Regions:
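Acidic, surface-exposed loops and disordered segments
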Residues: 1-173
């Protein structure tokens, strides 16, 4: 059985090479809206999405993330847009709620022909003094957990086909 949604799920791949041009506002808005419709525990919508497209903030996040990773390379792979997903630290299912947002963002991006990738280390970034200062600068108050970065852009290369699924992925009892 298949439909457009299932086909997008099957074909989405992490993109690690991007064209330098910025995505359109319409594409960004569509991806963001999809993120806001992610399931959340008790419908509380505990996540928050921060859009980063300016060069200075993008460079700061890249530097912070690379430091946590212990590398000099660009962990954001040159993507022109970074969506930082945060979750309310006091919510019962904060990380799960934020993770569902990340999934919706990436699937929506794929449905529009955009590349995306989940970049880790957001928790370490926003646990740091520099990360907390960024949140304050952005007007975000309270206790927040960095769930992930969803990087977005136009893929520089076509995605490779999916690897076969492992035979023991599903266990029916």
């Amino acid at each position: 059985m298949t439909n457009e949604t299932l086909q997008t799920i099957r074909s989405r791949r992490s993109c690690r090479a991007y064209e330098p041009r910025q995505i359109t506002d319409a594409e960004l808005d569509a991806v963001l809206e999809a993120g806001t419709y992610a399931a959340s525990a008790m419908g509380r919508q505990s996540a928050k999405i921060v859009v980063v497209q300016d060069a200075a903030t993008r460079a700061q996040l890249t530097r912070m993330n690379a430091a946590v990773m212990g590398t000099d390379s660009d962990p954001m792979y040159g993507a022109p847009t970074i969506l930082v997903v945060l979750a309310d630290a006091h919510a019962n299912c904060a990380v799960q709620d934020g993770s569902l947002v990340m999934g919706n963002l990436m699937l929506a991006a794929a449905s529009l022909g955009l590349g995306s990738c989940w970049i880790n280390r957001a928790r370490e970034e926003f646990d740091s003094a520099e990360g907390k200062a960024l949140l304050k600068k952005w007007g975000i108050e309270g206790d927040w957990i960095g769930v992930g970065h969803c990087i977005l852009g136009y893929p520089a290369t076509a995605p490779k086909p999916a690897a076969p699924r492992k035979p023991d992925y599903i266990v029916r009892v």
